Amino acid sequence: MSSLTPPNSNQMSALNNHFFFGLTTPKLEEFAPALEATLAYAVTDERVYERTAPEPPDRSWTTPTAAENPLSAWYVTTSISYTDGGPLAGRTVAIKDNVTVAGVPMMNGSRVVEGFTPRYDATVLRRLLDAGATKAGKAVCEDLCFSGSSVTSHPQPVRNPWDESHGYKAGGSSSGSEALVASGHVDCAVGGDGGGSIRIPLACCGIVGCKPTHGLKPYTFPIERTIDHLGPMTRTVGDAAMMLTVLAGTDGLDPRQADHRIEPVDYLAALAEPAGLRVVVVTEGFDTPVQDAAVDDAVRAAILVLRSGCLTVEIVSIPIHLDAFAVWNVIATEGAAYQMLDGNYYGMNTGGFYDPELIIHFSRRRLEHGHQLSKTVKLVGMGGRYTSETGGGKYAAAARQLVREVRAAYDLALARYDVLVMPTLPYTATKIPITDIPLADYLDTALSMIINTAPFDVTGHPALCPVAGAVHGLPVGMMIIGKAHDDDATVLRVAAFEHAVGNYPVPPEAASTLATL
């Protein structure tokens, strides 16, 4: 147990200067006894926590060899199960390594988190195990989950199973989760999405899954609470619906769920309902400045499949979609700098679960290993801190106000149609850089693909992504966006598309494995 030493005179002076209190030295000295008494309460709280914190379970885990981990997608492997029965009985699941598993080390793709072993299981893990799933391991993710590419994870990139030379990116930040499902190493996985981190690798690796409505599922290990989402990654819409059924619902620990009344829904049963007929193609989701025209063509061809299935398909313009990324960018940058970096992951001023040991571990390791953070995280830290200091919070406040306008524009279209449709990404998976590249190119490869995905993190709409086709021998994703808290209906529309196209293609090296499942 640590002790909290009262500040000395130099530290008192620094605190005074930080807040511009203008206290003279004699006045500062008057505050010293009162401050010491205040600090005593913090020490008392620490003693109580240490007395009540549970001991982590004794769970075995293994660091796989290179031969066992050809895609560099596993952080550690395990075999944890609770029951032989349940809707996920017999299914193996990979957990993104930003989700806590008691007694199993986690890294979150970063040297700053490396060495931490949590005492607690995340709610989503407990629900999966209670449903009969077997946890097969922790999947590698990007450094603090802040990259849409798969090149920032420590110690090496996650590789795309569609390329037999393993020279292409898997997408991020849930890079390992997607690669493991696509390659047949596991049946399903859990990922996180704050700017597209589930949907980007879905499109790159050619599987299906979703970012549900914000707050539908309890989150863990936050970046910025208002954009954090967890979601399922699977090979079929049916499996995604089954996972969503298991994982959805409040747990009393996640403040993201405080404003939502979440009733239990059987998303798998919803697939038996008649599909809606109104689909709208969002013009601004196509022909972006970085768009590959062949990707647009593949998505348009997939939309024709929807039309041939007797669905009404129309085209609409939502101009504010072009500005929505900028709104997300301010919130994600300032919010992550405040909560994830300065706030040592959790920040303050909200209810819910906190892990004091993780906070102090992150705080100490950030000071020791901050130089090893990815360039994307460094950009977020510097940019977010600068705009917050120079603007006094006005930029984040303005972005928060604009969220309402962006959400209202999507809701207006969704009031007349069942779902919105656009490409998930502007291009297919790209090659992993083989040498150090200029900063501008590095940031472009890590973040340029999220122009369509990020807006729906900030508005909270559910977004599901089936495979639309292939370009250059690599998968293309199509994003189908539904009404908030109407995830079951959105899943249904994606299932209608999946039924029309049949089975999705699989990576060459996974074909034999998946054929036996």
UniProtKB/Swiss-Prot annotation:
Q: Which residues form the active site?
A: K96 (charge relay system), S173 (charge relay system), S197 (acyl-ester intermediate)
What are its E.C. numbers?
3.5.1.4
The catalysed reaction is:
a monocarboxylic acid amide + H2O = a monocarboxylate + NH4(+)
Q: Tell me a Gene Ontology molecular-function term this record carries.
A: amidase activity
Q: What class of enzyme is it?
A: hydrolase
Domain of life (superkingdom): Bacteria
Induction of synthesis: By aromatic and aliphatic amides.
Keywords of the record, alphabetical order, are: Hydrolase
How this chain assembles, per its entry, is: Homooctamer.
Xref: PANTHER family: AMIDASE, TRANSAMIDASE
Q: What is this protein called?
A: Enantioselective amidase
Q: Which gene encodes it?
A: amdA
